[in-house]
Each structure stands twice: as structure tokens, then as C-alpha cells.
Amino acid sequence: MQNITDSWFVQGMIKATSDAWLKGWDERNGGNLTLRLDEADIAPFAANFHEKPRYIALSQPMPLLANTPFIVTGSGKFFRNVQLDPAANLGVVKIDSDGAGYHILWGLTHDAVPTSELPAHFLSHCERIKATHGKDRVIMHCHATNLIALTYVLENNTALITRKLWEGSTECLVVFPDGVGILPWMVPGTDEIGQATAQEMQKHSLVLWPFHGVFGSGPTLDETFGLIDTAEKSAEVLVKIYSMGGMKQTITREELVALGKRFGVTPLASAVALY
């Protein structure tokens, strides 16, 4: 009998959460991660499912996600412990046929529940499904140190944050040409911050929560982790630049345009036109 803990998706979640912990992005129970699956992914492991799956209603219906399975991190769970006990810290859930709630098919033992940021995740999944024609499958939230730091010293608007991150490392414009969305500070774990994040996810694969963290979206766990990692590396460079007295020179507008042409991407116009 196949064991679900050996599946590609459980093993992938173990690696992503462990890597994020080692990066210092997910202290204590900080951060959350969800991966949209297909029925074919989970079907071979039905023997591992709970005999009586618990049902939890969503705070608002999400018919676009009807009958869709996900693997999710649990509420109050530490990323550093996922590798030690996947079944206690992860869960496979499946949205019901009308999108009104979900059953916990596997994991989240001892009456654990999915991440408190599930509204933000599911709403963002809906928007990224539409924006990428179903290509994006992952939503990752973490407390990337240097990205958080920048929200204290830079004006919190999309064009400026995006432009500075592009300048912090040449690869950034190629990796996230759609720029970085940013919210005002909001109380986490609410439908309101979930809706605001999803609205930004219509246009951007990265969304900053000032003084808190970042949301990233991508087609795979590796791509999503790499997206955040790239932005965080640029933020680290910027933090060092500002601590050394600021930029003396940087990548110019003309060079950014040339970079976009070379790699066949269309940079966010407002960031290009900023100065």
C-alpha cells in the first residue's frame, strides 16, 4: 500500500517548509503554505484518509474551487516541525461540491485545523487561477526579514517598491516583471485582508503586507519559493545599500527596458516610468 507521506506533494511541502525555516522566514508558527492538487494526485492514497473526515464551513462560498483538493499547513504549527510529523502539521482538504466548505481528508491530527490565513489563500488561489489560466497552484506566506524591513523605510506604494527591488538585483525584473503589490497594514487572519490580498493577486504574483510579511504565488513549490527568495535577496542588498549611505549609481530606466526586451517580459509600466 502506498503511504501518503511518501507522495510528491507531502514531500514537497516538507522540503518547502524546512527550507523556509532554515532561511529564517518562519519563526515559531509564522508563515503558511497551500498547494492546489488534482483528484488524481490524492486518489492513490484513499486508504490513508480519515474514516470520518471533519467538515469545516468557509466564511464565504468559493464555487470556483468546488471539488478541489489542497494540501495546507496547520494553524499554530511550526514549519520546523513539519519534517518531524507531517500528519500533525499538514492536512489534505477537499472543497465540497458547492464551494461552501471543506473536509479534512488526511492529517491535521488531534483536531488541528488549517492555517488561520486560509481565507487569504483560497481567495488568492481563485484570482491566480483566473490570472494564469490555472497555471499557478501555490500560495506561500512568510516573514521574509529584509522585505519586511523595507516597508519601514520606503514609501509603501507598488511602483516604488517594485522599482527599488528591480534595481537591487538584475534578475528581479525577469523573475517578477509584474511587480510587487502592497497593502496598507491590516489585521491578519481576516476576510478583509484576504480580499485585499486577492485583489492585488489579480495583477501581481508578489504582495507585501507592511510590517508583517509577503505573499507569493507560482505554478510549483520550487517556483514560488524561488520567487520570494529572489525578492528577499534583492531586499537584503537594498538594506545593505541604505546602511552604507545609499545608492551612488543604479540600473537605469533604459537598462531596465533593454533587460525586459532581452528576456521577453513586459515590466510593470508604473515602475518603469517612475523616474
Curated annotation (Swiss-Prot):
Residue positions of the active site: E117
Binding site for Zn(2+): H141, H143, H212
Entry keyword Lyase: yes
Subunit structure of this chain's protein: Homotetramer.
Entries under Pfam families matching the protein: Aldolase_II
GO biological process: pentose catabolic process; rhamnose catabolic process
Substrates-to-products reaction catalysed: L-rhamnulose 1-phosphate = (S)-lactaldehyde + dihydroxyacetone phosphate
Pathway in which the depicted protein is active: Carbohydrate degradation; L-rhamnose degradation; glycerone phosphate from L-rhamnose: step 3/3
GO cellular component terms listed in the entry, alphabetical order: cytosol
Family to which the UniProt record says this protein belongs: Belongs to the aldolase class II family. RhaD subfamily.
Alphabetical keyword list: Cytoplasm, Lyase, Metal-binding, Rhamnose metabolism, Zinc
PANTHER family: FUCULOSE PHOSPHATE ALDOLASE, RHAMNULOSE-1-PHOSPHATE ALDOLASE
Keyword Zinc: yes
GO MF: aldehyde-lyase activity; metal ion binding; rhamnulose-1-phosphate aldolase activity
Cofactor binding notes: Binds 1 zinc ion per subunit.
UniProt-recorded name of the protein: Rhamnulose-1-phosphate aldolase
Organism: Salmonella typhimurium (strain LT2 / SGSC1412 / ATCC 700720)
Cofactor(s) this protein cannot do without: Zn(2+)
Function: Catalyzes the reversible cleavage of L-rhamnulose-1-phosphate to dihydroxyacetone phosphate (DHAP) and L-lactaldehyde.
EC number(s) given by UniProt: 4.1.2.19
